[in-house]
A protein has these predicted regions:
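Conserved alpha-helical positions within TPR/SEL1-like repeat arrays
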Residues: 333, 367-371, 437-441, 474-475, ...
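A structural micro-motif at secondary-structure boundaries
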Residues: 3-4, 15-37, 107, 111-115, ...
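Catalytic-center loop of serine/cysteine hydrolases
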Residues: 151-166, 195-209, 213-350, 359, ...
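Short amphipathic alpha-helical recognition elements used for nucleic-acid or partner binding
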Residues: 28-60
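Amphipathic alpha-helical segments of tetratricopeptide repeats
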Residues: 357, 390-391, 427, 460-461, ...
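DNA-binding patch around the recognition helix
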Residues: 2-10, 31, 43-48, 65-125
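Structural motif corresponding to the intra-repeat A-B loop/turn of tetratricopeptide repeats
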Residues: 342, 376, 412, 446, ...
Length: 882
């Protein structure tokens, strides 16, 4: 199907691209503030007609009352961009007493037309673009492809662009910050403020690529940077590898005394990380009340040293418009940003909230506040601030505007729109690794891993150190983690090795953290724990307490899988303390849920239920549906053990609704597996099989070897009830070998219990007793109360079948007393049935007849249809005395 052509407006040597909000003179973009561009569009669309001043002002500021001077300023900026003045106007004519008129004839054209106004060089560029477009077979709606020094003006396939002509990589600059020579802490905020403003100034015009402030902060934590005005050759070489930066700006500032009128002296040193030398020293002095002027002077001098053209007056106006409107807002924003980058999200959030109050219309304060809320686990509040940032982004540069919009779309989440925005950024700036990684992340989150991998393959073609950045490998790992754990593990290891080589310790920690999770999912717990601990130690050294808390959780999870509940509980409590100190409510909720799980496994059902009930509203407070869904898995298990089967089913269905909404197949697998248990206990075997098989299919789909084995064990238990004990025996034996190899003691004991039951159903009492003997050591170390009860009942039945009925009865009576004490009501019915079975074996059938009748009736009243049926069948097999 043919795509609709894009429309442009042309007049004189100019062309307007309305979709991209861009004015071009020939091929060169002409910088305009957003309001000046809107003014131009209104006048152009009313070409040769007078537009009254009031109409213009209402269109430009529909919700605000502004002075006419604001309109005059926009007209001034517009005329300056068009190369005219009020006295010598060719385009924007003043009609005294009325308004303004666009005096030139405007031509509306489509991108398929060959404009008569395009110069010869432009015609050649268009021809190339059209040839490439015809090979690619489709257009990208709404995106303009911008190569360094050459604006193409048409859309075509990004992969073809890179295949035909690799992007020109701009020189990169990292502003490392400035020492505060005043010695006064209250002036420290100027370091961040000056760094951010200078980065914005140098980025204007897009001739240089600026390293992000976040990456600079990370590098300063990772590398042993001295507190000096210049860096050694060795440190410069490390920065080149660590940051991918060709140039760095470093230096110091001092605030002169009040007698000097509150002036600031800024001393800068421009150093080349490749040649490993200082190439320029710059000193400027200006008013602290007008830091922009100080930065403009410094930026102009640095541009001159680098041979980069100066910022135009129009660009200067645009940059000034993108800054906070007052000193207090700038101070609070800078301090909040610095806190965020030091992993102090709670303090950063408070400062950024004050910054927003001081200047509610400053978009970047809202964007930073969104990041702070995300770090604290408040996704809904993060979304609200991201939306405000986007709504207020009109005064920002085009690049900044797209970055703000991309974040808004991603956290909404509207991943398809985020893909569109990040693709636009990456197309405009193909040498910017950050934008490529953002695009791949959005594609991955949108469920398009193949697209993400294609984007990442393109990034790998960038020259080193960009193309060898370990973050590319981490994104590859994320894109394939659901389908190929082995390859994901290899990518994570490669990322870690690259991080070690470049000195990027925090990237090593990220790689190890991801590797730990993968090893946990593979059931390789003994390998996972030291990897988690390595990540934790790196985070601790960097002061990243959230990273520490997360790794404590990961290690605790592995300990749970190993059956070491005491150590797991200790680790979860330590993690909870870290999250509380951070003010991370989502982390606190998760830790409460984990603690509830440990208390539950330890047999304290009442306390566990209280912790679950406390965690659920916290999850809902931060709107963490994924965390809530995982909690509901454990809550459903607890409800089943308390013989609250209908409640357990309802809980599972609630969790499934949450997990399906986010397409979380991992949690869906757990919930389906848990749902099968109450259904089986109710005697609904066909329904139970259906959900167990769905669980297994999901776990196989996402390559979860460990949890898939758990699903097979549940199906084996069900097979016994269906009369297929031989099949159950084989499955249980296979699972035991797998669990033993993965050091999964709890799962091994579960499989052993099911194997014993299968052997007893087959009449293989001796084999069942042998299994009990072999698993004695594992059983003695078990700390998982529900699994321990399940195994103990099966082991006692095996003892009874082998003739040791007195010992078996004694064990079962002890088990029953424990179950009554702890509240494991569902197991009480199983234990009573096993005791009745011993009495029948011992020839005391008449004595147990009444107990079986009572057991069947009570089980049925609690919904335990399977036990009720077994008790009734056992009672019917007892001969009636005549």
């Amino acid at each position: 199907m043919a795509m609709e052509n894009k429309r442009f407006y042309e007049f004189g040597p100019f062309r307007i691209d309305p979709e991209e909000h861009q004015l071009l003179r020939g091929e060169e973009p002409v910088p305009l503030t957003p309001k000046a561009f809107e003014t131009l569009m209104i006048l152009v669309r009313s070409s040769e007609r007078v537009v009254p001043k009031d109409d213009l002002m209402k269109s430009l500021w529909p919700d605000s009352f502004v002075e006419e001077a604001n309109l005059s300023q926009n007209i001034f900026i517009l005329r300056k961009a068009l190369g005219e003045t009020a006295q010598n106007a060719r385009y924007v004519m003043t009609v005294p007493g009325r308004g303004y008129r666009f005096a030139q004839k405007v031509r509306e054209v489509s991108d398929g037309e060959a404009s008569l106004l395009v110069q010869s060089q432009s015609i050649h560029t268009v021809t190339i673009a059209e040839k490439r477009r015809s090979r690619s077979g489709f257009l990208w709606a709404g995106l303009a492809v911008l190569a360094v020094g050459c604006w193409v003006g048409y859309q075509f396939n990004l992969r073809r662009i890179h295949a035909a002509a690799p992007p020109v990589v701009r020189r990169s600059v990292a502003v490392l910050g400035f020492r505060n020579l005043t010695g006064r802490p209250e002036e420290s905020w100027l370091s961040t403020a000056l760094s951010e403003m200078l980065s914005t100034e140098l980025a204007t015009g897009n001739k240089l690529r600026l390293v992000s402030g976040e990456d600079v902060a990370r590098s300063k934590l990772e590398l042993p940077l001295t507190d000096a005005d210049s860096l050694s050759r060795d440190t410069l070489a490390r920065l080149h590898t660590n940051l991918g930066s060709d140039l760095i700006v470093i230096g110091s500032y001092t605030v002169l005394d009040e007698k000097s009128g509150g002036r600031v002296r800024l001393d800068l040193h421009l150093q080349d990380t490749v040649a490993q030398e200082t190439i320029a020293d710059v000193a400027v002095v200006g008013s602290e009340a007008d830091l922009f002027e100080v930065v403009t002077q410094a930026g102009s001098r640095l541009r001159e040293k680098l041979g980069v053209e100066a910022v135009s007056e129009v660009e200067e106006v645009s940059v000034r418009a993108s800054l906070p409107s007052n000193r207090e807002a700038a101070r609070l924003y800078s301090e909040g940003l610095a806190r965020l980058r030091r992993y102090e999200a709670l303090e950063g959030r408070e400062l950024l909230e004050q910054s927003v109050a001081a200047d509610p219309k400053y978009a970047l304060s809202h964007a930073a506040l969104s990041a702070a809320w995300t770090a604290l686990g408040y996704d809904a509040k993060a979304r609200a601030e991201a939306a405000k940032a986007y709504a207020l982004s009109g005064n920002l540069s085009r690049e900044e505007r797209l970055v703000v919009e991309g974040n808004d779309r991603f956290v909404t989440p509207d991943y398809e729109k985020a893909i569109e925005i990040y693709r636009a950024l990456y197309t405009l700036f193909p040498d910017n690794l950050e934008y490529g990684l953002d695009l791949a992340k959005a594609q991955d989150f949108a469920g398009r891993p193949s697209d993400a991998l294609s984007t990442l393959a393109t990034l790998q073609k960038l020259p080193a150190p960009l193309g060898t950045d370990p973050r590319i490998d981490l994104r590859i790992s994320s894109a394939i983690s659901d389908s190929d754990h082995a390859k994901a593990l290899a990518a994570e290891e490669q990322a870690a090795q690259k991080g070690l080589a470049s000195g990027s310790k925090l990237l090593v920690a990220r790689a190890r953290r991801s590797e730990c999770a993968t090893l946990n999912n593979l059931g390789r717990l003994n390998e996972a724990i030291p990897v988690c601990e390595e990540a934790m130690h790196i985070y601790a050294a960097a002061g990243d307490h959230e990273g520490v808390a997360t790794e404590l959780n990961d290690i605790a999870y592995a300990r749970v899988q190993q059956g070491n509940l005491t150590e797991a509980k200790k680790l979860f409590e330590e993690a909870a303390q870290n999250f509380r100190e951070l003010g991370n409510d989502d982390g606190v909720a998760s830790t409460l849920a984990n603690l509830a799980g440990i208390v539950y496994l330890d047999g304290n059902l009442a306390e566990a239920k209280k912790l679950f009930d406390e965690a659920i509203p916290r999850y809902r407070k931060v709107e963490d549906s994924e965390g809530e869904a995982l909690l509901l898995v454990n809550l459903a298990a607890l409800q089943t053990d308390r013989a609250e089967l209908r409640a357990a089913e309802h809980t599972c269905q609630q969790g499934l609704a949450l997990a399906q909404r986010t397409n979380d197949k991992h949690t869906q697998g757990y919930l389906l597996a848990e749902l099968g248990d109450p259904l089986m206990r109710e005697g609904k075997l066909a329904e139970s099989r259906k959900v167990y098989e769905q669980s297994l299919a999901l776990r196989n789909e996402v390559s979860e070897k460990q949890t898939a084995a758990e699903s097979r064990i549940y199906l084996a238990e069900l097979a016994i009830e269906e009369g297929h004990a031989a099949d159950a025996e084989k499955s249980a034996r296979d699972a035991m070998v797998e669990f033993r190899g993965g050091q999964q003691a709890d799962d091994e004991l579960t499989a052993a219990a099911i194997l014993i039951e299968a052997l007893l159903a087959e009449g293989k009492a001796s084999d069942a007793k042998d299994t009990v003997d072999r698993e004695a050591d594992v059983a003695s170390k078990n700390q998982n109360r529900p699994i321990g009860l399940k195994y103990a009942i099966a082991a006692a039945r095996a003892l009874a079948a082998s003739g040791k009925m007195t010992e078996a009865k004694s064990r079962l009576e002890s088990i029953l007393a424990e179950e009554k004490k702890t509240g494991f009501q569902a197991y009480q019915f199983e234990t009573r049935l096993a005791l009745a079975e011993i009495e029948v074996r011992a020839g005391h059938a008449d004595a147990v007849r009444a107990e079986l009748v009572s057991l069947a009736r009570q089980a049925q009243s609690r919904g335990l249809g399977l036990i009720a049926r077994k008790a009734a069948e056992m009672q019917r097999r007892i001969p009636v005395k005549t």
